[in-house]
Amino acid sequence: RPSFNSWG
């Protein structure tokens, strides 16, 4: 879950 996506 990388921080650039909506879930991370």
Curated annotation (Swiss-Prot):
<keyword id="KW-0527">Neuropeptide</keyword>
<keyword id="KW-0027">Amidation</keyword>
<comment type="function">
    <text>Mediates visceral muscle contractile activity (myotropic activity).</text>
</comment>
<dbReference type="GO" id="GO:0007218">
    <property type="term" value="P:neuropeptide signaling pathway"/>
</dbReference>
<dbReference type="Pfam" id="PF08260">
    <property type="entry name" value="Kinin"/>
</dbReference>
<feature type="modified residue" description="Glycine amide">
    <location>
        <position position="8"/>
    </location>
</feature>
<keyword id="KW-0964">Secreted</keyword>
<dbReference type="GO" id="GO:0005576">
    <property type="term" value="C:extracellular region"/>
</dbReference>
<comment type="similarity">
    <text>Belongs to the kinin family.</text>
</comment>
<protein>
    <recommendedName>
        <fullName>Kinin-1</fullName>
    </recommendedName>
</protein>
<dbReference type="InterPro" id="IPR013202">
    <property type="entry name" value="Kinin_peptide"/>
</dbReference>
